[in-house]
Amino acid sequence: MLTVAIAKGRLLKSFITYLKQANEQELVDALEKRERQLLISVGSIQIVLVKGSDVPIYVEQGVADVGIVGSDILEEGNYTINNLVDLPFGDCHFALAAKPETSSFNKIATSYVKTARAYFEAQGIDVELVKLSGSIELACLVEMVDGIVDIVQTGTTLKSNGLVEKDTIKPINAKLITNKQSYFKKSSEIDAFLSTLEVSLIDHR
């Protein structure tokens, strides 16, 4: 049995869409009919659905053999895992966003402090960073901050809140990570799972 931790939300939706394109209907059916289940078994695979930021922790602790998680999560943390390969779904990007009239930034809200700090340091701009867990756009709307650094996929949320993208910071994509021991002990199972995803590890071992 190979245990796979997958981030709920945006990435899970992208994963299901990709599985449909790969004609992996058994996995698609199990994920779409899960209701509130967090543990799903399909053949020799057990899927664990967790919060994105928890995926590398489940993998690091050995509860999950492999994980599917956004590169944004990995860049913000420091985990003892194998970061194996990019996956062909889940593409989006980090962006600096603000009201259209805003041209200078002194105070920024974000859930991604490490990424935001690196961006502004590279720009030579000294800003105060306010860490928030959700509804980042609101901080800009109530003028608590001058702008936000957040993940943008379609831009719909920004537009609906009267915000615009001021700069694209860096791309984000889905990554396959593995537990360090599982990487060797379950190499054949991992290869079989990646074959399902039409991804090869030939260049990564």
UniProtKB/Swiss-Prot annotation:
Family named by the database record: Belongs to the ATP phosphoribosyltransferase family. Short subfamily.
Entry note about domains: Lacks the C-terminal regulatory region which is replaced by HisZ.
Reported function: Catalyzes the condensation of ATP and 5-phosphoribose 1-diphosphate to form N'-(5'-phosphoribosyl)-ATP (PR-ATP). Has a crucial role in the pathway because the rate of histidine biosynthesis seems to be controlled primarily by regulation of HisG enzymatic activity.
Pfam families found in the cross-reference section: HisG (PF01634)
Enzyme type, top EC level: transferase
Protein name per its UniProtKB record: ATP phosphoribosyltransferase
PANTHER family with a match to the protein in the record: ATP PHOSPHORIBOSYLTRANSFERASE (PTHR21403:SF8), ATP PHOSPHORIBOSYLTRANSFERASE ATP-PRTASE (PTHR21403)
InterPro entries: ATP_PRibTrfase_cat (IPR013820), ATP_PRibTrfase_HisG (IPR001348), ATP_PRibTrfase_HisG_short (IPR024893)
Record GO cellular component, one term: cytoplasm
UniProt subunit comment: Heteromultimer composed of HisG and HisZ subunits.
Pathway: Amino-acid biosynthesis; L-histidine biosynthesis; L-histidine from 5-phospho-alpha-D-ribose 1-diphosphate: step 1/9
EC number from the UniProt entry: 2.4.2.17
UniProt source species: Staphylococcus saprophyticus subsp. saprophyticus (strain ATCC 15305 / DSM 20229 / NCIMB 8711 / NCTC 7292 / S-41)
Highest taxon listed in the record's lineage: Bacteria
GO molecular-function terms, A-Z: ATP binding; ATP phosphoribosyltransferase activity
Example GO biological process: L-histidine biosynthetic process
Protein's cellular compartments: Cytoplasm
